[in-house]
Amino acid sequence: MDKATLRHEVSNNLTLLEEELRSFAANVGAGLWRKSVANLYYAAYDATCALLWSKGIKAESHEGAQSMLSLHFVKAGAMPKGTTKNLSLLLSLRHSADYKGDVSISAQDVLEQRKWVIGFVKSAMDIIGAGSLGISATAVLTALKDAERVAIKEHGEGGGRS
């Protein structure tokens, strides 16, 4: 695969990542914890796909992305050992948020997941930035800072619904 194609695919995933982070900030502001969890998962997934594309690897599924992330980044030592486990837990939480109305999703859940996702995305951007594709992640880093700064408050404090 040529560099132009890889740059294009990584950039596409970074655009999706930026949009998820911006949507996350808006959903947190509205107190929509379920949507916030989904945004966090998709931000992590889009960062994963961008990482994989930076090595010329196309993920065919969410599970495939996790497997390839583990093989090419975790086992290689570029990402911490718990990365794939955290991504899997976040996927499970996203499934609950999207499909199980009887499962409560709280501001605390969002706070905990945000911390991990922010660290993961920062690491992914460092790896992509250190690569040879010459891709700028400025928009993602700006959206990441906004996602990190947005206040997460419980129902009575921030309004909205879970």
Predicted regions and their residues:
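Terminal alpha-helical segments
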Residues: M1-S162
